[in-house]
Amino acid sequence: MRIVTIIGARPQFIKAAVVCRAIRQMALQGAEIEESILHTGQHYDYTMSELFFHQLDLPAPKWHLNCGNDMQRMKASIQPILEAERPDIVIVYGDTYSTLAGAETAAELGIPVAHIEAGLRSFNPTMPEEHNRIKTDQIATWRFCPTGTAVVNLHNEGITEGVFHVGDVMYDAACIFTPKEEKQLSIIRQYHLTAKEFAIATIHRAATAENTEALSNIFIALSQLPMPVLLPLHPHTAKTVEHNSTLQVLLEQATNVQVVKPVGYLEMLALERLAALIITDSGGMQKEAYFQGTPCVTLREETEWKETVEAGWNHLAGTGSQGILDAIHMPFSRQHIEEYSDGHSAERIIHILYEDVNR
């Protein structure tokens, strides 16, 4: 079985890492299976890309396209590669432009697509990610769902075949890669932080990172927290701040907010584990907060990870200053979530694909 995996953004590197491990494990057990990685270049700087490959022991990409966020350029670059390779399966992850570009190009060439993290819905049609998810699920042959809710979403859209509830590969990754306690403490000491006495905040979605009013409100709210806040600034957010003097002043006046460059995955896991609170607009970090036992406030009005809200680990706050502060001070009930499975989701995915292709 020959696989081409198409990835391009940080969350996809994490998910692909555990699936790559499962593929290597099957190959060592004698299965005829090989994988080649195509990196679209959607995340292109060192911390957002190469560092993750190094930390996660991901094989070097066979192809690196440097396409940025240009989906049509991605498709034009992916097409000749898939035509030459003719893999049995193309694997795509999540909801980025790389996801949809890979899925559409493979489908146009008659190559079956496996969508990992299928069936998620925020029910916000203005989000590009929502469009990418829906289109990719319509194209895919195999739809690997992290939760029962995702399965129900697909069934409600009339998609019932090729749907598998396998658990969450991000939980696999957290189980494998979370640093030991001593390493966690050494990481937070680099930032002069004390365990469970700081918040970690991230802002990266275009709807937030390119919205100066939203960023102003968020920075004002962060400045009013009664604890230090570590803010690894995503390149998109940093670019907006760089071109807006008001945002720069707000950050300078927020004396409790420590702005740093983006951190690697292992560092982020340690920071999440030892933080008192996570504040984010990231989908993945909402789950990681639960995996690491840390409450989360999400800077959005809706989420595709409804289980985290229903179980009392995650409050939806939007981007208004008062809404954020209110959410921070609301109690978190922190109930157990069964949905994310047992840390062996990647193995289940590869076994299903291998059995189907070799029938």
List the model feature ranges, each with a label.
Residues Q42, E50, E182-L274:
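Donor-nucleotide binding loops and adjacent catalytic segments primarily
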Residues V4-I7, F13-G30, L51-H54, H64-G158:
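Active-site and donor-binding regions of nucleotide-sugar-utilizing enzymes
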Residues L56, Y290-H336:
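Nucleotide-sugar donor-binding patch of glycosyltransferase catalytic domains
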Residues W63-C67, C145, F164-H165, Q258-K261, ...:
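Short acidic-hydrophobic, aromatic-tinged amphipathic segments that line or gate anion-handling sites
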Residues T149, H315-R359:
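Leloir-type glycosyltransferase catalytic cores
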Residues V92-Y93, L100-A103, H115-I116, R143, ...:
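A donor-sugar binding/catalytic signature common to diverse glycosyltransferases
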